[in-house]
Amino acid sequence: MTASSNDDDLIFECYSDPELKRWTHLANAKAWKGILTVQQYADREQLLGSSEISQKNKSNEMMTKYPKSYQWLGQKYFVLKDRSLPDNGKFSQVVSSCETLNRIGYCIHPGSNGKIEPALIVCIGGVFTFENHRGKGYAKKMIIKLNEFYDKIRDDANTVLELKNLVINLYSEVGEYYSALGYESMHVPLHRISKLDELTERYCGEDDDHDGKYLGFDDYRGLVGLHETQFKESLLSLHKENPEKFVFTVAPDFDIFTWFQYRDLFIMNKSGRKAQQNLFFGYALSDNSHIIWHHNWNGDSLIIVKIHIPEETFQRKELKLKKLLRKAIEETKLHGLQELEFWDEEIPIKKYPQLFQLLTELENESKVFSENGSISAVRPPKGYTAEQVIWDNNTKFCWF
């Protein structure tokens, strides 16, 4: 029996069984384990699933702030079962699986009267069909049912704004596969820099910052709090320019950054690398301008997750950008990584002519604007087309 021949046999479930989670992660490890072993990958997924952002539905703060929706926050797990298959084991009828990481976001739209409203931002990940069940349309059926699952939550929201404003997005590693399922690509190119010494010498200049500080694992909550104002100002500005559009962003949250750090440290420790001394996760200047990064041990690169520079004159902003990039380059080299990487929406290089010109001189065009292996895609909210949606902060920051 195939998925397309009898949909009545297909059962879509949201589950919490830890044994099933482990089973699905052991099965899909081959696709995403990178330099880890299968067991290590499953261990990492268990660790990430128990992180603060993944367990947000258990947060007292969220329960108080969002009493009618907190249960939908955090990481959720789903499977598709085919009951026409032999029932000869606990998971023998499971054919596909996926997960979502649900976070609070903000939005502004024509019906919000110029006010920013909360939104539940649902990000799909881990879409996987088990090897012996491929080619039967199961993944497509699962995503259709996932769409329906979250549509019902939105449609039953009544006056709960964050549920009424629910948005689903994903990061596709299979090109435009999800376009047939209602997801519109919003690709953001990557910038991959390998000529680190040249960039330091010709763009960043001398290290004259003596009052800044490196960021450890959990000592920069106050800095992330600064993103709140910047994010909301950006939404209001985009709304003013595009009053007819639905503009949204994932909200800043310190727990998003620690999620990256858990990944970072786990892979470092399991990959056979020596324990890295003086491992930092970012740098802040004395005025609280700062950069937060992620050591991508799998890809031998340092990825800029977020950069925050208070709005000033362009000249002063670029001066601070140079200082922060210098610190990122130093971190890249210190730990033997080969490239510095960032998304164009994080640092739109064409807005910095000096940086853009230098990168085009130093690097091959395929690195200056590299195709992103994780294509951002969004399912437009009810009543909007893709052209009427703006995804702000569409960067590594909200990747899952």
From Swiss-Prot:
Pfam families: GNAT_LYC1-like
GO CC field: cytoplasm; nucleus
GO terms classed as biological process: regulation of cell size
InterPro entries found in the cross-reference section: Acyl_CoA_acyltransferase (IPR016181), GNAT_LYC1-like (IPR055100), LAT (IPR053013)
TM annotation in the entry: none
Note: Present with 768 molecules/cell in log phase SD medium.
PANTHER family listed in its UniProt record: LYSINE ACETYLTRANSFERASE (PTHR34815), N-ACETYLTRANSFERASE DOMAIN-CONTAINING PROTEIN (PTHR34815:SF2)
Protein name: Uncharacterized protein YGR111W
